[in-house]
Amino acid sequence: STTSSLDGSVVSFGMSPVSSESQRALDVVAKIAGRPADIKRVGPASLDLCKVADGTYDASFEPHLHEWDVPAVSAGAVVIWEAQGHLTQWNGESVHWRQENDVMATNGLITNDLSQYLA
């Protein structure tokens, strides 16, 4: 997408069925509420990443992706990179493929805008 600000963007998020892990995602949603035009909770991380890559979403974030999520996330990562998007951990570091990660994907234009809320 060409959206250059969190304001007016479309953002998706994922969360675990484990309440202690999910609370972090819900806290971020509460912080950014009112800035994006829409905040969606749709499906698996791999689908969210592909929707960022094709421009349906401007960004997606999910805390605490587990090791068993890595195959889906790594496939989605290739799609993001091919679309010139941006994929990192919430702290800005590269995703580590053999451990749990807090993942953020963006169109590359709103990374800094979103990352300030992912603490």
Language-model segment annotations:
Residues 2-119:
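An extended, acidic
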